[in-house]
Amino acid sequence: GRLGMKVDTKGDFTMTGNYEIRRGEYTFTFQNIINKRFQIQPNSRITWTGDPYGALLDVTAAYRQYTSLSPLLPASSTSADQSRRYPVDLVIKLNGDLGSPAISYDLDVKEYPASSDFRQAVTAFKSRIQSNDQELTRQVSSVLIFNQLLPEGTNLFDQNQVNSGVA
């Protein structure tokens, strides 16, 4: 993008313009234990209207994790496709002021079998995480920490979940 930078005779510095990000990477680190590489999505941008520290963010990044969708399926479901891993994107969006952006998350199940069991389970999952912030946070945390989705009603740190996530 085009950026304008000015320094006046008093030493005041201003920036104006848009910086469009076509590609890039952001490494999410938690307690030096969890490191996940997020890919910055095309058309993300940073806009300056004067104050260099007052930039406005409109940035989207995604981390892809291949995981089983079986936690989303009914317990009675028996399909050979259950054990397969499917791409799930953990999406983070930063919007607003550079110093204190609004941060939002989403999970996007990219590909899955066309069977009615999978279609219904994924649709119900998407509806649940869109209408329940606590459920979205629980699922995002599970993907970040354990690289897997959780069945509905399961505690994030249930001992069986910890054991299977670490294995």
Residue ranges and their predicted role:
Residues 156-157:
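Charged, low-complexity interaction regions
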Residues 1-152:
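Strand-loop-strand
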Residues 161-167:
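Short, intrinsically disordered, charge-balanced linker/junction segments flanking boundaries
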